[in-house]
Amino acid sequence: MKVRPSVKPICEKCKVIKRKGKVMVICSNPKHKQRQG
């Protein structure tokens, strides 16, 4: 899980979602997981 100020999809399987007010990227590749904050 990477925590960074700007989250962007890295590959075509990355999905940008909102959970509890936080913007997150979920992907089948665990290296692509990101959270904003």
Swiss-Prot record:
Keyword terms of this UniProt record: Ribonucleoprotein, Ribosomal protein
GO cellular component terms given for this protein: cytoplasm; ribonucleoprotein complex; ribosome
InterPro entries membership: Ribosomal_bL36 (IPR000473), Ribosomal_bL36_sp (IPR035977)
GO MF annotations, alphabetized: structural constituent of ribosome
Record carries keyword Ribonucleoprotein: yes
A Pfam family matched in the record: Ribosomal_L36
Name the UniProt record assigns to this protein: Large ribosomal subunit protein bL36
GO process annotations (BP): translation
TM spans (from-to): none
Family statement: Belongs to the bacterial ribosomal protein bL36 family.
The keyword Oxidoreductase belongs to this UniProt entry's keyword annotation: no
Top-level taxon of the source organism: Bacteria
PANTHER family the UniProt entry points to: 50S RIBOSOMAL PROTEIN L36, CHLOROPLASTIC, LARGE RIBOSOMAL SUBUNIT PROTEIN BL36C
